[in-house]
Amino acid sequence: MTVKASYAFLLEQSFVVPHCVWKWRPVYGDLYWDATWSQFTFSNFLRTAVDLSWKITHGVLHNLDRLASFGYTNLKNCYCGQSGESLEHLFYSCPLAQSVLGWVSVLFLSAVPDCPSLRPRHVLFGFSSEELSRVPKVFAVILILYKWSIWLARNDYHFGDRRPCVDDVLASLKAHICFVVRCHFRKSWNDRRAFVKHWSANGLLASVHGDSLLVKI
């Protein structure tokens, strides 16, 4: 029996509802957890970014609010000046987050005009199953990479006294997106149609020319 089969068997025999389900219900209501978990498997590149999103989803990321709940004092404010640092503030409401999300939203709405604007639930938990039926996979991964880029800038501020710049965060995000798109281009050499649909967003992010790829961002 494989490790995967053993783990699946144990889950069936002793299923426990993850703590995050109860943690976030008073704030965001009943969420689409199966869809959230599935989005962590869309890309196996940049695993550290996926791990960060997993911590965010479970509410165990060591942001300022969580550190304060452990009794830590003399913590810096957020780089925007607000005291405290909730996950929603850091990744959605903060002016830096809003500026970078503005660029992401333009891409998203260009690819899927009939989908709703990005809300906190999208940023923290990804897309619902219904939305995923219309949204190319690359956008679920872009949200993961977006949070990773914001987190890197946040850590540079708290541990290196380097105030974040929108242009630097955007450059980091674009570089990570290009890397992932190119990796999936090489991985899907025998299924270009799936690549064009899910990873180039039907030509919005990249175009295929024979065996070469032109990334447009």
Write out the residue ranges for each language-model feature:
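Short amphipathic alpha-helical segments and their helix-coil junctions
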Residues: P26-T41, S117-R134
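Short amphipathic alpha-helical interface patches used for protein-protein assembly/oligomerization
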Residues: L64-R66, L101-V106, I150-R162
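Short amphipathic alpha-helical segments embedded in low-complexity Lys/Glu-rich regions
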Residues: S69-G71, S93-P95, P164-V169, K187-A194
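Short flanking/linker segments adjacent to small metal-binding domains or redox-active Cys/His motifs
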Residues: S133-D161
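Short secondary-structure subsegments characteristic of cysteine-rich extracellular domains
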Residues: P164-V181
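C-terminal helix/juxtamembrane-tail motif
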Residues: N190-I217
